[in-house]
Curated annotation (Swiss-Prot):
NCBIfam families: aspS_bact, PRK00476.1. It is an enzyme of class 6 (ligase). GO terms for molecular function: aspartate-tRNA ligase activity; aspartate-tRNA(Asn) ligase activity; ATP binding; nucleic acid binding. Its main location: cytoplasm. ATP binds at residues 221-223, 230, 492, 544-547. SUPFAM superfamilies: Class II aaRS and biotin synthetases, GAD domain-like, Nucleic acid-binding proteins. One of its GO terms (biological process) is aspartyl-tRNA aminoacylation. Homodimer. It is found in: Cytoplasm. It catalyses: tRNA(Asx) + L-aspartate + ATP = L-aspartyl-tRNA(Asx) + AMP + diphosphate. This is Aspartate--tRNA(Asp/Asn) ligase. Belongs to the class-II aminoacyl-tRNA synthetase family. Type 1 subfamily. One of its GO terms (cellular component) is cytoplasm.
């Protein structure tokens, strides 16, 4: 391999018995057993046991002085381990290396934690990320990330896609998430924006005739962070010309099947099911439903319109209200304490409470039910609830009644919490498998109550369905988009759309978004001009590489599959970024910081 080593530690097996090897790596552990020193030597491929006998005094003295995380080089002979001392958990578990020479390449100060400690706080791990990355799980995660990226590149290359870089310094467009801004020194008072997506550039590459484009690139969004968000994230960005929506979906569905098979030996469905956005929201309260959970909403809005119980009747009679039931088979066994905990849980999502009915005996109707709300419901409503939910003896029905968004968010989250719980898994409410699907036919627009205007649900370059073009000017709320999301186990793996390729339609969409012609020209004139030069029909997708690898690795957070991530406060604990900068740098950028107003003293 090199003059310093002949093999990786973790790849030395019994086939090399009797051979001389040179190994380099880090000391995982050093043990002194009756005058013989054992060293677990680690590199990126795993561990090997090194045995140091005292019959080589110089080597043995060096072995006595080494400690955990010393970087060392050893030479020695591979031999079988004594019978009964084999380690089946290691690739090298049947052999050991009898050390002839040991060189300390670089000692280590005492590490702040043991690398095999699985109970470290994330703050500790991110502060000492260099050491954290030495741990086998992190090594696995980042190598898996590399493998996924390589499989993507191989697939797209075979399909005729060209890897083209697009600018990192671009124009700020205040639509959507907040931009990261970069001041221009040579253009005082002007700013670049780091890209939230290469969206417009990749469309212009289609206008330029490149036909099939991709890149694996960094994108940036200055937004509040969650477990699956980072201020900078990696996108597998793809665009193609002259394909229909169905052909685009088929192509990238095949890509994901190939990547999952080659990266982690998982066979995804031969054909991903397709679900309309409207159906996903009706059944699951989410546009990225986790189909592993065998629970669904039952629509009860009409049933509750005439009940003498305002908790249900008020939202049922409201234009933006909704009432649903969530039947949990066998849920009658859920304790009152657990119900109280669920009530607190849905409150996180804005729910004011959590009504419930335990079904003891369906045949007895009202008398077979247990709940404080039964007295507020008339017999016809009770009968309809039991009928529509398909309730059986021993079930529980939870209810959501509020604005549709609150109901969807809160009961949707409750559905997942129950499904993923020990109770859900023990009662067949969760299937531990891979459940991909396409969600299609998204609304083109959603109404922003605060700004009193329509906003793009995806982005303003998504094409409306051909039969809905007339709604752009008459009723934007009716307009459906040629948009599609690939969902897997409740995560959006990627999303895309067929794009607008005619300048006149793009202008109509801008107007529907309350962007007048002058504003559109100022912000997107270069795109409108490009579309006039015979732009081809085109569309594409963007996949979140971080999310894909997180799912494959079974990690708790995307921070576990990124080498140097930011915290939920958008900070890098390793380098202490962001940080203050020198006054001279600010002057060169023509920037002056406004001092924080001091608080008045009492």
């Amino acid at each position: 391999m090199s003059s310093m080593r002949t093999h990786y530690c973790g790849l030395v097996t019994e086939q090399f018995s009797g051979q001389e090897v040179a190994l380099t790596g880090w000391v995982q552990r050093r043990r002194d057993h009756g005058g013989v020193i054992f060293i677990d030597l680690r590199d990126r491929e795993g561990l090997v046991q090194v045995v140091c006998d005292p019959d080589r005094p110089e080597m043995f003295k060096a072995a006595e002085e080494i400690r955990n995380e010393f970087c060392i080089r050893v030479t020695g002979k591979v031999r079988p381990r004594p019978a009964g001392t084999e380690n089946a958990n290691l690739t090298s578990g049947k052999i050991e290396v009898l050390c002839h020479e040991l060189t300390v390449l670089n000692p280590s100060v005492t590490p702040p934690f043991q690398l095999d400690d699985d109970n470290l706080s994330e703050t500790t791990r991110l502060t000492h990320r260099v050491l954290d990355l030495r741990r086998p799980q992190m090594q696995y995660n980042l190598r898996l990330r590399y493998k996924v990226a390589m499989e993507v590149r191989k697939f797209l290359d075979a399909q005729g896609f060209i890897d083209i870089e697009t600018p990192m310094l671009g124009k700020s467009t205040p639509e959507g998430a907040r931009d990261y801004l970069v001041p221009s020194r040579v253009n005082p008072g002007h700013f670049f924006a780091l890209p939230q997506s290469p969206q417009i550039f990749k469309q212009m590459l289609m206008v330029s005739g490149f036909d099939r484009y991709y890149q694996i690139t960094k994108c940036f969004r200055d937004e509040d962070l969650r477990a699956d968000r980072q201020p900078e994230f990696t996108q597998i960005d793809c665009e193609t010309s002259f394909l229909t929506e169905q052909e685009i979906r088929d192509l990238f569905e095949d890509m994901m099947r190939t990547v999952f098979k080659n990266a982690i030996d998982v066979d995804l469905d031969a054909r991903f099911p397709v679900m309309e956005f409207r159906e996903a929201m009706a059944r699951f309260g989410s546009d990225k439903p986790d189909l592993r959970v065998k629970l669904e909403f039952t629509e009860l809005t009409e049933v509750m319109k005439d009940v003498d119980f305002k908790v249900f009747s008020s939202p049922a009679n409201s234009d933006n209200g909704r009432v649903v039931g969530l039947r949990v088979p066998g849920g009658g066994a859920i304790s009152r304490g657990e119900i109280d905990a669920y009530t607190q849980f849905v409150g996180i999502y804005g729910a004011k409470g959590l009504a419930w009915i335990k079904v003891n005996e369906v045949a007895k109707g009202r008398d077979g039910l247990q709940s404080p709300i039964v007295k507020n419901l008339h017999d016809a409503a009770i009968a309809e609830i039991l009928k529509r939910t398909g309730a059986q003896d021993g079930d529980i029905i939870f209810f959501g009644a509020d604005k549709a968004k609150v109901v969807n968010d809160s009961i949707g989250a409750l559905r997942l919490k129950i499904g993923h719980s020990d109770f859900g898994k023990a009662n067949g409410l969760f299937e531990d498998t891979w459940k991909p699907l396409w969600v299609v036919d998204f609304p083109m627009f959603e109404y922003d109550e605060e700004d009193a205007r329509w906003v793009a649900m995806h982005h303003p370059f998504t094409s409306p369905k051909d039969e809905h073009l007339e709604y752009l000017e008459t009723d934007p709320g009716k307009c459906l988009a040629k948009a599609y999301d690939m969902v897997l186990n409740g995560w959006e793996m990627g999303g895309g759309s067929v794009r607008i390729f005619r300048s006149d339609i793009q202008s109509k969409v801008f107007r529907a978004l309350n962007i007048n012609d002058d504003e559109a020209r100022a912000k997107f004139g270069y795109l409108l001009d490009a579309l006039q030069y015979g732009a081809p029909p085109h569309g594409g997708l963007a996949f979140g590489l971080d999310r894909i690898v997180t799912m494959m690795a079974g990690a708790d957070s995307i921070r576990d599959v990124i080498a140097f991530p930011k915290t939920q406060r958008a900070q890098d604990l390793l380098t202490q970024a962001p940080s203050s900068v020198d006054e001279k740098q600010l002057r060169e950028l023509h920037i002056r910081l406004r001092a924080t107003e001091p608080k008045p003293t009492a």
